[in-house]
A protein has these predicted regions:
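Extracytoplasmic electrostatic interaction patches
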Residues: 75-204
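N-terminal export/targeting and maturation segments
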Residues: 16-109
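Hydrophobic membrane-insertion alpha-helices, especially the h-region
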Residues: 4-22
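Generic detector of bulky aromatic hydrophobic side chains
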Residues: 4, 8-10, 40-43, 55, ...
């Protein structure tokens, strides 16, 4: 009887181990970036290997306010001239688990559009969103109300097709290509893998 129970327990352990291994396997390119950075951001952040990408100088940090939120920026030489910055950041808190990639593109001397690619690791969802940034009195005002964002973009002649092009230029052709250059990815900028994509401007 004990032998049978031992065999059953061993079998259950094997099944659980296989299940755990399977569920932890990256199902898409954003899973890869999230998992590999989570493993390394406290020691030798894997993203340091991207040419021209600079981890925020305060990392790694033991400050409880930003312990789980590492980020970095591309330097000016590696940032296309139409953009003021490109950032890759994370929130590794168990309640969040988010990877975000954003770029800021100028529309005028005091107005720019921020294109977000936010990946929710827990749910496997990539959200593509746009925010307007206005410079007022040496400070920045962020506008994320969808109708206001759309109105501003229309004023500057920016269409949904343009937003797709901005997203593709930075996320696909820049960040994800760079990722594939430093990591033996199963995926690519044209093949994300298993991920649900939600686009804010899809029906604009």
């Amino acid at each position: 009887m004990k032998k049978i129970l031992g065999i059953v327990a061993l079998f259950a352990l094997i099944v659980l181990s296989c299940f755990y291994f399977f569920t932890k396997q990256p199902k898409n390119i954003f899973d890869e970036i999230y998992q590999e950075t989570e493993k390394t951001y406290r020691t030798n952040n894997i993203l340091r290997h991207i040419d021209g990408f600079e981890i925020s100088p305060g990392w790694p940090s033991d400050d409880p306010n930003n312990l789980y939120t590492p980020f970095g920026l591309y330097n000016k030489e590696k940032t296309p001239s139409d953009y003021s910055e490109i950032e890759i950041g994370f929130n590794f808190r168990s309640s969040q688990k988010v990877l975000f990639i954003y770029s800021e593109r100028s529309l005028s001397s005091n107005v720019s559009v921020k294109i977000w690619g936010s990946y929710n690791y827990k749910f496997g969802v990539l959200s593509k969103e746009a925010t307007i940034i206005k410079k007022e009195n040496n400070s920045k005002v962020y506008i994320d109300d969808q109708s206001e964002v759309k109105s501003y973009l229309e004023q500057y002649g920016v269409t949904a097709k343009d937003l797709d092009a901005y997203y593709d230029e930075i996320v696909n052709q820049k960040v994800l290509k760079d990722w594939c250059s430093i990591y033996d990815s199963k995926y690519s900028p044209s093949n994300y893998g298993e991920v649900k994509v939600e686009t804010q401007w899809e029906n604009w």
